[in-house]
Amino acid sequence: MVMLDVLSNALMSVKNAESRGDRQVIIWPSSKLIGNVLRVMQRYGYVGEFEYVYDGRGGKYVVQLLGRINDIGAIKPRFHVKVDELQKWEEKYLPARQVGILILTTSKGVVSHLEARENRVGGILVAYVY
């Protein structure tokens, strides 16, 4: 099977495990971007602890699920967003005000849309979670 987008594959693995009611999911293959996205999701309480396990084939993440994710997905194509345009993208991808987060890659690292607005930085949209 050809993996074209490892982030999208990882987020779909989390979504499928959540819908089955699993308490943990193994994400393979892994990347630094996946680790940073998981860190943002952990900061907002969507996933529990996670750890990187190196297995000699690129590594994998073992993620503890909390059952708090209703929907999650990668945003494709990856849109470049200015800080003033974040409201428009919130309305497009999130179900209501103050519900969920958009995840962006910025010059300050991988952050949520709330942190990007606070730091006044734009970036590239990569995912949404609520």
Swiss-Prot record:
The keyword ATP-binding does not apply. Belongs to the universal ribosomal protein uS8 family. PANTHER family: 40S RIBOSOMAL PROTEIN S15A. Part of the 30S ribosomal subunit. Keywords: Ribonucleoprotein, Ribosomal protein, RNA-binding, rRNA-binding. InterPro entries: Ribosomal_uS8, Ribosomal_uS8_CS, Ribosomal_uS8_sf. This is Small ribosomal subunit protein uS8. It comes from the Archaea. GO terms for cellular component: ribonucleoprotein complex; ribosome. The gene is rps8. The keyword DNA-binding does not apply.
